[in-house]
């Protein structure tokens, strides 16, 4: 498993934007498709809302990649 850290610069980041910023998805459209397909989990729960607000302390997982948001 590959672990990543992401430092927020505001209160939250939308899930699809986070995947694109960390290059876990090749584009915004690809990120939205991955989320819609149920390939992304937030804090251990499958997340299908592309604009889900991700805040500090949450953990996002896509395949073998895990992102800790700080």
PLM feature segments, named:
Residues 1-13:
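A detector for short, charged/polar N-terminal pre-domain segments
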Residues 10-56:
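A basic, amphipathic helix-loop patch mediating RNA/tRNA/ribosome contacts
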Residues 4-5, 59-70:
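A positively charged, amphipathic N-terminal helix/segment that binds anionic biomolecules
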């Amino acid at each position: 498993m590959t672990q990543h850290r992401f430092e927020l610069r505001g209160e939250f980041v939308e899930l699809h934007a986070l995947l694109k910023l960390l290059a876990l998805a090749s584009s915004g459209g690809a990120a939205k498709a991955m989320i819609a397909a149920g390939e992304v989990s937030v804090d251990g729960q499958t997340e299908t809302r592309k604009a889900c607000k991700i805040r500090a302390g949450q953990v996002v997982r896509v395949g073998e990649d895990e992102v800790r948001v700080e």
